Amino acid sequence: MLFTSISFLYYFLPIVLILYFITPKKYRNYILLIFSIIFYMYGEPKYVILMLVEIIVAYFGALLIDKYKSKEIFLITIIIHIGLLCVFKYTDLFIGTINSIFKTNISFLNIALPIGISFYTFQILSYVIDVYRGKVKVQKNILKLATYVSLFPQLIAGPIVRYETICGELDNRDETIEKFSLGVRRFIIGLAKKVLIANMLGELCTKFSLVDERSVLFYWIFAISYMLQVYFDFSAYSDMAIGLGKMFGFTFLENFNYPFISKSITEFWRRWHISLSSWFKDYVYIPLGGSRKGTLKLVRNILIVWFLTGIWHGAAYNFILWGLFIGVFLVIEKLWLSKYISKLPKVLRNIYVLFIIMISFIMFNAGSINEAFFNIKGLFGLNKEVFINNYTIYYLKSYLIVLIIAIFGATPLFKNIIEKLKKSKCLNKIINILEPIFLVILLLLVTAYLIDSSYNPFLYFRF
């Protein structure tokens, strides 16, 4: 089930909210658990069993780890979860690699990827690791652990919520009118970002893939549009997840912090998909030694993390290329580039970041490595195409307003303007009156679009 579907917005969510708030507090987790499983079953009925098996393994594994302080039990539990992720996500990549290297003809298994497996597996792993480290207390109520893992606001596309951040809220959380209203506001803003901006940018990117007569300018428009589409698509889902969490009394950590204003690649990845970046930092990079054990190990650790980050996003070589490309730039910045770019004007540093990230997302989007390099060459006119043509002019005119809104919306500009206006008591009152009206208008526009549109999944569902 999609957050951006009529069935979710006007049937599932209202029913869950009504039943949740009329239920006594001590039973509300059960309502969330039941409806989270129904939510998942709507799209993946057979893979509910897989998720429940992983929850059971994590529950008993953590209990045994806590009781016996056993490294062996810890490793077995971790291997089971990583093993299941690898089987369902990487089997065909492995078979394809074997076929390419050894010229064999092993048939692909074509295993369907369970929605959200990368996200909920990482949540389970963080819980088990933190229990082993003594960072969190083991959860002795399997239903509470199941609620944590399967909580529908963040189940299928994050953010990756750590057990330590919401364990207290599983037992006791504040559900206030203020928190609920903030949740509704955040959810509607995320909904509008997805439907009115990300989907429109996605249409433009689709047009690019269908046009035979491309131009150099069209390659640039596509590259910028796709980069913005990924941002608005995924940050929109995070907004909706955080908003839904607030409605039910949970506080999820922020997942994006205006990454496109960054002045270095390092800063960009502190601001983009924060829950994933911090996960790899805490559970892979630091345990490997981080930056403490010499230059060679620093390089090794960064490249390992970014190889894993790339392959986490998808079982294809373009994702590995994307991850290693980012990793190499992070290494270069760490070793020497940062001291030079820090002397440049802020605008030039920002342009440098945007260019590198744009190139990386061309790799991220490509169906193959050859396609990635072909599209990168197109940016520089190396595919023997004209600089501009009629197709480019037509599509630029058609999507110019959306592009402008997206470019400025990816910065704190609108937020800063509103905050400055709110410093005036008079304007603050006007904004407080107009904001609910604006949100209702957004919801109506989104609803009209959804009624008239087809399937519009989030990009990160495939991860």
List where the protein language model places each region.
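Membrane-embedded transmembrane alpha-helical bundles that form the catalytic cores
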Residues: 1-462
